[in-house]
Amino acid sequence: MGRLLSCLIALSLVACDTRAEWLERVADGIMGTRIAVELWAEDKNSGNDAIEAVLAEMRRVDAVMSTYKPASELSVVNARAADTPVTITPELFDLLATALDYSRVTHGAFDITYASVGYMYDYRRHVRPTNEQIQDALPGIDYRHVLLDRNARTVRYARPGVKIDLGGIAKGHAVDRGIAILQGRGIKHCLVTAGGDSRIVGDRFGQPWIVGIRHPDRKDEVIARIPLEDDAISTSGDYERYFDENGKRYHHILDPRTGQSASKVRSATVIGPTATRTDGLSKTAFVLGAERAIELYEKLGDIDAVLVKPDGTVLYTKGLQPPAGARQH
């Protein structure tokens, strides 16, 4: 009854307020991915202004946290933190603290110091480090090498050779920042997406948003459709940034223990309260394996997930109802 009433109210609003508009915008090239914003606005001008504000915020976050921009705050940290404590902005400090918390919760499966080896990969040019190069750089991977001083608001590295990359969490953070901007403008129905990371507020025309999870090998095939309202969702897959060589796939999600591409799942979709959280936790299944990851997500309590194993088996957390015929954890 409550859902029916909500739908009738939404339809009534559509019929009565001819000024209200549903707006959509897609922008490429921000944070190295595609950004999409959808929202229900009181009028077209205010809606477009809100979208522009979100895109500007995405560019700002990228300018701070990109490792591809030598002048970014994160690049400065990587250049100096092995030698001296580096004072950083509250935003970067808090995100680093969050990332380290995820590392502790996942027992190191999520680790931003993967970049100590990861920087040697170039997936566009099909470049990978040799085993010798990996072994030489591997001691730099350990989240405990990243030392934060909250009172001084500094970060330093415990040893030379440490590099960090926030690629596993920064897009989710940018999505959350975009949503905060929209909510600050009074927008109650919207979606912000950066690559595989999305956050949803409210509904879409009185109905839940329907999010499809693609098959790892067949991009036009959907393995599950999930109705969402007021949730974040992140999907990570070994089909995003990769190259194949001699029958082996090298992709961007690395196992911190080996410096090699993690291969225990093909795809991980995580649903939770914020995109920062789902972005970070979606990577961990590749390292932990599907069964251990499901156990972790259910223990956390605010996370649901759909995982695709290498053999095609699909596992779900208990909070999700799997499609008929699917194999469930």
Give short role names for the model-derived ranges:
Residues 2-6, 16-329:
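Mature catalytic core of soluble alpha/beta enzymes
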